[in-house]
Structure formats: structure tokens, C-alpha cells
Amino acid sequence: EKSEEGVVISNFVGYMFDKACEFEVKKIYFIGELGKFVKVAGGIFHTHSRVSDAKMEILAANALLVGEKLENVYKILESNTTEEASGYIEKKEVFNLLAEKAKQKCEEHCRKNGWNLEVETLILSAEKEVIGHSKHFFDNF
């Protein structure tokens, strides 16, 4: 039976994916803002800033991977928020790269715990506009 339920997960990404697997969820459409996705793309599953914070480093590394200008990478590293940092990004494909990495990290997290869960990801700007998504996010819409 197909269900289309939405759940707010706060900072406990790993815990919520574990619970989804326990309830035998087959597919999750993971939607959220850039700051959370940057951390998950880096393999961080408890995203509260008191526990973990490497957003700018992860964002800068991925910006380099897509060929972002070095001067912009330095500005990203000096930014206070991912919203500010995103203003320095010219190579917008970095957002799709982050979405794809977050998808892979979530699926790997579940596989390590013995579950097979399909995840698709969508990244929103602070203004709630779509800025990135995994390759197959829109396939079933």
C-alpha cells in the first residue's frame, strides 16, 4: 500500500532514517534546506550545530569539485551561514552534487544497519526555492 506521509525530522537525521527502516518504509523523499543537506552530504547524521558543524568546509570542498573559482571558495569558507555562502557560488551544479551525495549517504546509513531504503533528495534555499535535487527525484511525479 502506497502512503504519502510527511514527517518533520529536526536535527536527528540518522535516528529518523533508522525509524523509517524499522517501519519498513521503502522510499523517502528527503526535502530540506541547504545547511542540513551539506552536513548529510558529508556523512553527518546529527545536524545540530552544537554536535557537529563542518558546513562551510563540506560546501567549499564540493564547490572545488565542480570547478568553482578559488576566490569564491575562500569566501565560502569565511561565510557565517550557508545562505551567505550560496551567494558566492557560481557553479550551481554543486547543489545537485550535494543532493546526490546526501542521497547516497542516507542509503549507505540504512544499508549498514541491514535495511534497503531508496532515498531521493531535494534542496531548498532559505527562500524555499528548489536549488538542487538528486537525479531521480522527479521521476515519479
Language-model features: locations:
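A structural signal for small-residue-enriched, beta-sheet-centric alpha/beta enzyme cores
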Residues: 1-96, 122-124
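Extended hydrophobic packing segments that form well-structured cores
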Residues: 99-141
